Design a protein with these regions (language model features):
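N-terminal small-domain helix-loop-helix segment of the aminotransferase-like
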Residues: 2-103, 110, 277, 289-292, ...
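Conserved PLP-anchoring active-site segment centered on the Schiff-base-forming lysine
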Residues: 114-136
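A short helix-loop-beta submotif of the ANL/AMP-binding
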Residues: 138-144
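Active-site phosphate-binding strand-loop segment of PLP-dependent enzymes
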Residues: 144, 149-220
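PLP-dependent enzyme catalytic core of the Aspartate aminotransferase-like
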Residues: 162-163, 344-350, 354-363, 369-406
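Conserved glycine-rich beta-strand-loop-beta hairpin in the small C-terminal domain of fold type I
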Residues: 287, 303-317, 325-339, 373
Length: 406
């Protein structure tokens, strides 16, 4: 009898933020065990609510959002995004250069499917948000990982990036602010990346979903604004800044010499048309969300929840013998380093699985972010201080006598 297996296209695709360790956590929960999930940046379950005017706007427009929209998105949303690009100093963006999406995730899949032929190479950061590597692979390409240097605040290593460019390289991916490290790249680093793209005729994909979540007075700069002569696809959305991850509301913007990308843009239009349109009720809140008071800023100042939780987890992690971490400047993740020799760790997935089973706290291992060594893991610091303290205490207790057994 015939059996049905997954496509071979998926053989090398993984997304361990929601992978085998999460499956085990879900099994534990189904058996009645309470698990604290610190594996995914989903603000709402931790008590972060969307601004009231955003919710009211969706309710008000819902009756008028029952049909399809233009495949690029509704006019009001794209107009607001165009104005946001002006604030970000991204030049010459017209309405037709903007595409709304069901979150940035859908758009990552779209931009890679539209560009990549079998064997093409895309430079992707290590560590990365793993959907980038997964989508490049699914499209038939090869994700070539350049190192982000922990000793330099997790900034990209430009020379490593340069050394990995070949005649098969088509694009550079940057994630700024970065997930999982929380790094925010300064102008100088972005200008060096732009110079590489310019020198080797590469396009740039810039994932900027956390650009409104910076702390400590750190300014975010869009690489598209610094390199108007380089073809860039800049991605953003409301999931994190407005705490509406479940609404699936993202967008991408094309900038730079678009006449050099006519064929690619034709492909993007085809893919956009094939999915008809993105979520219309979510599109309807973009104008209010971007034009209104940015209430997320209150969370990011001293005394605000995200700021204080970042301060706590940074100190707590660095106080645990065998752990160290660079202080994140944005988003809500920290990416600690663990002394693998001290704990005899050879398999970071087993480490987080052991911790989950013993302490009922779910983390994500570093290799899930395409980090090459088993010496890092990611903590989401969205829970309140009481929950974070409990998680940090459990981690300290667990590591006090942990020795990995394979």
């Amino acid at each position: 009898m015939r059996t049905f297996d997954k496509s071979s296209k998926l053989d090398n695709v993984c997304y361990d933020v929601r992978g085998p360790v999460l499956d085990e956590a879900n099994r534990m929960q189904e058996s009645g065990i309470d698990v604290l999930k610190l594996n995914i940046g989903n603000p709402a379950p931790f008590g972060f609510n969307a601004p009231e005017e955003v919710i009211l706007d969706m309710i008000y427009t819902l009756r008028h959002s029952q049909g399809y929209s233009d495949s690029h998105g509704i006019f009001a949303a794209r107009k607001a995004i165009m104005q946001y690009c002006q604030i970000k100093k991204i030049k010459d963006v017209a309405l037709e250069d903007i595409y709304t999406g069901n979150g940035v995730s859908e758009l990552i899949n779209m931009v890679t499917q539209g560009l990549i032929d079998d064997g093409d190479e895309i430079l992707v950061p290590s560590p990365d948000y793993p959907l980038w590597t997964g989508c490049v692979t699914l499209a038939g390409g090869k994700a070539v990982h350049y190192i982000c240097d922990e000793q330099s605040d997790w900034y990209p290593d430009i020379e490593d990036m340069r050394s990995k460019i070949t005649d098969k390289t088509k694009a550079i991916v940057i994630i700024n602010p970065n997930n999982p490290t929380g790094a925010v790249y300064p102008k100088e680093v972005l200008e060096e990346i732009a110079a590489l793209a310019r020198e080797h005729d590469l396009m740039i994909f810039s994932d900027e979903i956390y650009d409104r979540l910076t702390m400590d007075g750190v300014a975010h700069h869009s690489i598209a604004a610094l390199a108007p002569d380089v073809f860039c696809v800049t991605m953003n959305g409301l999931s994190k800044s407005h705490m509406v991850a479940g609404f699936r509301c993202g967008w991408m913007v094309l900038s730079g010499p678009k006449e050099r990308a006519k064929g690619y843009i034709e492909g993007l239009n085809m893919l956009s048309n094939m999915r008809l349109c993105s979520n219309v009720p979510a599109q309807s809140i973009v104008q209010t969300a971007l034009g209104g008071f940015q209430s997320v800023q209150e969370y990011l100042q001293p005394g605000g929840r995200i700021y204080e939780q970042r301060e706590y987890i940074y100190k707590a992690v660095n106080d645990i013998p065998g752990l160290s971490a660079v202080k994140p400047k944005a988003a809500f993740y920290i990416f600690p380093k663990i002394d693998t020799k001290r704990f005899h760790i050879l398999d970071d997935e087993k480490f987080v699985l052991d911790f989950l089973k013993e302490k009922k706290v779910l983390l994500t291992h570093g290799k899930g972010f395409n980090w090459g060594e088993p010496d890092h893991f990611r903590i989401v610091y969205l829970p309140n201080l009481e929950q974070l303290k409990s998680a940090a205490d459990k981690l300290a207790d667990f590591l006090s006598d942990y020795q990995q057994k394979l």
